[in-house]
Amino acid sequence: MVKISMKELLEAGVHFGHQTKRWNPKMKPYIFGARNGIYIVDLQKTVRMFRTACEFVSDVVANGGSVLFVGTKKQAREAVYEEANRAEAYYVHNRWLGGMLTNFQTIKKGIDRLNYLNEIKLNETINLFPKKERLKLEKERVKLDANLGGIRTMTKLPSVIFIIDPKNEAIAVREAKRLNIPTVAVVDTNCDPDDIDYVIPGNDDAIRAIRLLTSRIAEAVVQGKQIAAERRAAEQDKAADDKAQEQAAAEAAKPEPAAPAPAAEAAEEAPAEEGPIIEVIKKSGSEEDGEAAN
């Protein structure tokens, strides 16, 4: 199970919220107090809610689900890119395109185009195009990769979306809610937590805080994949054992081969085979007796 401590949260500055004049009253249950005009997040609740969120993410992935990391603000881009890649998860870290979820079939056409451009660059068939056309295609590829590179292998909608700053990613939150896709988000004191399924109260502006929380969610994804792999291995072993048992049962059900003929029967047949030889001997004996008589 993924763990996080109060000490780690404090050192990363997760407890620092926004200025008291820039807050959302709906975040009041998660606020410990205020200091020097800045709200302080209740880290005890953060630890508890973060653990719940990690368990949820791990369970979803263990059951074959996928996670999409979303963080397009400057402070979050690097952490989202690196941690999502480490967990081999999908990500959007530059710009959220409207309809990325609700109009996925159209987005999928862009993904297919990107994959095609990547392929012709990799196998160098792009060099067969005129220079002007090559430059145009490369420019198109770079633009598509910036927006769709993190989801280029995504063939269907994700099972969960992890978001840094739901206020900044309001479009992504709305699309996920419309499609009933669960959301896990780092929610600061200026955000509305109502549209988030798994709230993680904390600082969504500090780079260290974002890095810490994102890395632990990535660990939950990795853990879920390990559990899924172990389950598949166990199922394969069980299937192999069942097959071996079926084969053993089939062998046991086969009829036994017929027993060899008793020795007595062989003895009864022997005189019949020796008959001609005995007749020859008798005949020879008769001839010898005749000669002796003469």
Swiss-Prot record:
Listed CDD domains: RPS2 (cd01425)
Top-level taxon of origin: Bacteria
Biological process according to GO: translation
Compositional bias segments (type: Low complexity): 246-265
Region (Disordered): 232-294
Biased composition (Basic and acidic residues): 232-245
InterPro entries tied to this protein: Ribosomal_uS2, Ribosomal_uS2_bac/mit/plastid, Ribosomal_uS2_CS, Ribosomal_uS2_flav_dom_sf
Keyword Protein transport: no
UniProt entry tagged with the keyword Ribosomal protein: yes
GO annotation, cellular component aspect: cytosolic small ribosomal subunit
MF terms in GO: structural constituent of ribosome
Keywords: Ribonucleoprotein, Ribosomal protein
UniProt similarity note: Belongs to the universal ribosomal protein uS2 family.
Protein name: Small ribosomal subunit protein uS2
